[in-house]
């Protein structure tokens, strides 16, 4: 299909076994863009289950300006965001040398959740965030139930005394795996030193409990950093 200028055109080429190429030709420059604008969804349904972008091409998300994903070299992908060309994320497969995720000059954070106080059994669900902030309610807590995800990781719980203070966790620090069943390895936290920490009881003071969750063996290792004062 050609316009009045015969040097600018659109063509469909069909090769062996029906392999088809759609192309445009701009004789003067390189702005023979191809726009697909359906009045509905654009559906890609290849029988091979593959949608292929050539090596080192860029997939843009802001109209072709400065936010894109691209393959830098074999087995290395970068996410570039913003007009400064910042590398927000880089993924690299290094064979026998392992795999690497680099955040470059980016910081990484979590939404801090606030578990609901329950005097009998307060639930802290690390499946939804690695960082949790719990304030005692009108009394102490008997048991603390910790839910961990399917993967291993580091998790932190900040525990704050209320304005009255003298609140304690007297019972068990129970450990549950991702499916909400008791951890098969050890069903309670394994604390440094062998016993539950003695929490600070002064009003408004803070303790931070840090856990390493070994998802393979289903064991939560805990250490307490005590008595942040205000």
Question: Model regions: which residues?
Answer:
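Intrinsic low-complexity, repeat-rich intrinsically disordered segments enriched
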Residues: 1-129
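Acidic, glycine/polar-enriched metal-coordinating patches/loops
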Residues: 76, 135-230
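Low-complexity, glycine/proline/serine-rich flexible segments
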Residues: 126-130, 134-138
